[in-house]
């Protein structure tokens, strides 16, 4: 069946977004398209309808293709936990932790088998597969055990686009160097070059493009301009670049940039609000006095909690809350807000009982069992009756110490989260909570009320519609500058 692959000379070349754009462009032509990434290393994850865990980037690409995300689209997900260890998620399920030096010894064979099984299923279900590589396909020390780049392209005999980030400089050297390091059978799969993130006029680049085509015999199929839109990021390093100030912002929200922050795509809907300035605060930064503080999810909640305490930021958050500030915790952040976290089995690698922030009268117990599921519920606060969707990804269960009337469930299912009666403290296990437009606006209005600001309308839809518009804008921005015709005609 037809398949394309996108690989990059480096990490952060833009592979994920270009893959998403191609998925949307093929969908517009009437094809049923599946994205695929054999192995992804990321802390942003999504739970499929079947209860499996995949990288959020592959879920985003599936939405670009207009299909439901499935575990076959990302059969191996590695979730870094620090100290050169990662949790291994195989076919949607966590199967253990591994050291980097042990991973390929323990998982290479079973991983390649999972990749082949996933591709076979996708070939049966879809017209096209658009594959994304990882990092660079030319890492000499890793090529013999690379599961996700040109091994996949060779398996599918997929024509491959080699993508380079021209904004970094050295793009011609990157392209030529990558080609030189590929084996002949790998090099034969490279059918086109794509320059990404170009700022300037193409005619100033043309002499270099002509030289490249003459030198390699491979056509340049795209020179894609810099796209100045806020698309989902896979790497927390990208958060450091999100410093754009909104002149019309009336509310400021500080998201704590934990060392192992996870699922920070939760905040894309907040960043889409023109009146909201989202500021990512590192452990060495001043908290200040924003309108709200959010403690996000974490892949290693205990380690991040200890780092938060050592930095002094934990005390700053407690002082902020004591002064009447609003604090919201999601998943690991919710767990941190309690009295204690107990990990008696060393699920995260550190055994013991650990002091939380003492903002909620809750205790959290970690167990080896991981909760993975999509959820539908109804809100009780800040506005009752709102339909809510989201998903859970967590290890551990949280219990309220007492039947205190000071704390109320946020949703019909009280296990999903709680808040205090004053609306200052919020905690939930639900990822994607801000995707629910009416709930997001109701929560923001509680912050605006304290500032004496006019309430925002709450009769808005789910963020899914905005995300789809964003994907359309991405495809519209890419289409004039990416010539897929030679590949599509050949296939």
Curated annotation (Swiss-Prot):
Keywords attached to this entry: Cobalamin biosynthesis, Glutamine amidotransferase
Gene Ontology biological process terms from the UniProt entry: cobalamin biosynthetic process
Species of origin: Synechococcus elongatus (strain ATCC 33912 / PCC 7942 / FACHB-805)
Annotated catalytic residues: 331, 431
Gene from which the chain derives: cobQ
Molecular function terms, GO-annotated: ABC-type vitamin B12 transporter activity; catalytic activity
UniProt entry tagged with the keyword Metal-binding: no
Protein name: Cobyric acid synthase
Keyword Ubl conjugation: no
Family listed: Belongs to the CobB/CobQ family. CobQ subfamily.
């Amino acid at each position: 069946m037809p398949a394309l692959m996108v690989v990059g000379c480096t990490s952060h070349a833009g592979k994920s977004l270009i893959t998403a754009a191609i998925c949307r462009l093929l969908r517009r032509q009437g094809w049923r398209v599946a994205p695929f990434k054999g192995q992804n290393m990321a802390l942003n994850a999504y739970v499929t309808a079947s209860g499996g865990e995949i990288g959020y980037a592959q879920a985003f690409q599936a939405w670009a293709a207009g299909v439901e995300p499935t575990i076959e689209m990302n059969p191996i997900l590695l979730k870094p936990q620090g100290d050169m260890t990662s949790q291994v998620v195989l076919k949607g399920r966590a199967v253990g932790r591994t050291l980097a030096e042990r991973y390929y010894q323990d998982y290479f064979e079973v991983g390649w088998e999972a990749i082949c099984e996933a591709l076979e299923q996708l070939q049966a279900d879809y017209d096209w597969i658009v594959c994304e590589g990882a990092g660079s396909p030319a890492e000499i020390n890793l090529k013999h055990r690379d599961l996700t780049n040109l091994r996949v392209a060779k398996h599918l005999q997929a024509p491959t686009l080699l993508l380079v980030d021209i904004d970094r400089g050295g793009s011609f050297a990157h392209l030529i160097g990558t080609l030189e390091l590929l084996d002949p059978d790998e090099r034969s799969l490279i059918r086109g070059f794509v320059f990404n993130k170009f700022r300037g006029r193409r005619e100033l680049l043309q002499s270099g493009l002509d030289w490249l085509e003459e030198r390699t015999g491979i056509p340049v199929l795209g020179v894609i301009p810099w796209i100045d839109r806020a698309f989902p990021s896979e790497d927390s390093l990208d958060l450091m670049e999100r410093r754009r100030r909104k002149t019309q912002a009336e509310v400021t929200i500080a998201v704590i940039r934990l060392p192992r922050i996870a699922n920070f795509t939760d905040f894309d809907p907040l960043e889409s609000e023109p009146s909201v300035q989202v500021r990512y605060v590192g452990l060495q930064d001043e908290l200040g006095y924003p309108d709200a503080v959010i403690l996000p999810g974490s892949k290693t909640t205990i380690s991040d909690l200890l780092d938060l305490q050592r930095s002094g930021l934990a005390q700053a958050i407690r002082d902020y809350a004591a002064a009447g500030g609003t604090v919201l915790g999601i998943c690991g952040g919710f767990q941190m807000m309690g009295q204690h976290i107990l990990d008696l089995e060393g699920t995260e690698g550190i055994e013991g009982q650990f002091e939380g922030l003492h903002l909620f009268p809750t205790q959290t117990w970690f167990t080896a069992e991981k909760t993975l599921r999509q959820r539908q519920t109804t809100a009780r606060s800040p506005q009752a009756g709102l339909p809510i969707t989201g998903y859970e990804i967590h290890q551990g269960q949280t219990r309220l110490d007492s039947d205190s009337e000071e704390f109320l469930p946020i949703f019909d299912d009280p296990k999903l989260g709680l808040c205090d009666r004053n609306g200052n403290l919020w905690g939930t296990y639900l990822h994607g909570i801000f995707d629910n437009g009416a709930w997001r606006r109701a929560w923001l209005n509680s912050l605006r009320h304290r500032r004496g600001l006019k309430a925002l309308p709450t009769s808005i839809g789910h963020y899914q519609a905005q995300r789809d518009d964003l994907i359309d804008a991405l495809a519209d921005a890419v289409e004039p500058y990416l010539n897929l015709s030679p590949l599509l005609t050949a296939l």
